[in-house]
Amino acid sequence: MYQPLLLLPLLLTSAFATPHDPTTHQALDKRASFPIPSSKGSVTYSSPKSVSGTFDGGLKTYGRGVKCSGQKEGGDKDAVFILEDGATLKNAIIGADQIEGVHCKGSCTIQNVWWTDVCEDALSLKGSGSGTHRIIGGGARNADDKVIQHNSGGKVTIQDFTVQNFGKLYRACGNCSKQFKRTVEISGVKASSGKSLVGINSNYGDTATISGCASSVKEICVEYEGTDNNDKEPKKKGSGPSNACKYKEPLSKC
């Protein structure tokens, strides 16, 4: 019986609406879209590209010419880039035709690198060191599970990164055979449509410091009981701000 009453204001609104303003819609589309730069070309590698020193990708799209295998665990042979200790990868777009994205064998810097469609993981931080891994700018989307997998020790800083439609932005390895204390500092993140922003193992002393904005992200920081038994899955302990998960709730909307 209330339908006519609801319909009348809508008709009046339509009758007196202002003319269509395309600039308004363009602004909304730009805000909601994934801000990946335009590609300057494409490169397909038959094997992983090893990087020592600095590799500037010139904003070309890089891939391996293969179909994503989903969440089936790959290895170094499936990566697009493998960065040696201390290497820098910048100004590159990782295409959808790959499995393992980028691997770091030690400390590394990832600057203005974009993943169009994440397969198994976008970025895997490996090795046994305790250095610093820096992710500056860039972004990733369409990750069924993890974007950044932190297997090594040390510190990860993630600055001004955009992530959309994801399982986890960052996950400290929950069941690696060798475990470490890991820290992650995230600032200026723009996250939307995700399950959890961060996952850490607080029983190993992991900490996460987080700032930025998040829209439609179910959990910001999740604590797990990590294990060094690769045959077991880590147990979830809880989520929300704590001594290990350092942020102010709620994060602002993007």
Swiss-Prot record:
Organism of this sequence: Neosartorya fischeri (strain ATCC 1020 / DSM 3700 / CBS 544.65 / FGSC A1164 / JCM 1740 / NRRL 181 / WB 181)
Statement: the UniProt record of this protein carries the keyword Chaperone: no
Cofactor annotation comment: Binds 1 Ca(2+) ion per subunit.
InterPro entries (alphabetical): Pectate_lyase_PlyH/PlyE-like (IPR004898), Pectin_lyas_fold (IPR012334), Pectin_lyase_fold/virulence (IPR011050)
Signal peptide (residue range): 1-17
Xref: SUPFAM superfamilies: Pectin lyase-like (SSF51126)
Entry keywords, A to Z: Calcium, Carbohydrate metabolism, Cell wall biogenesis/degradation, Glycoprotein, Lyase, Polysaccharide degradation, Secreted, Signal
Protein name (database record): Probable pectate lyase E
Major place of residence: secreted
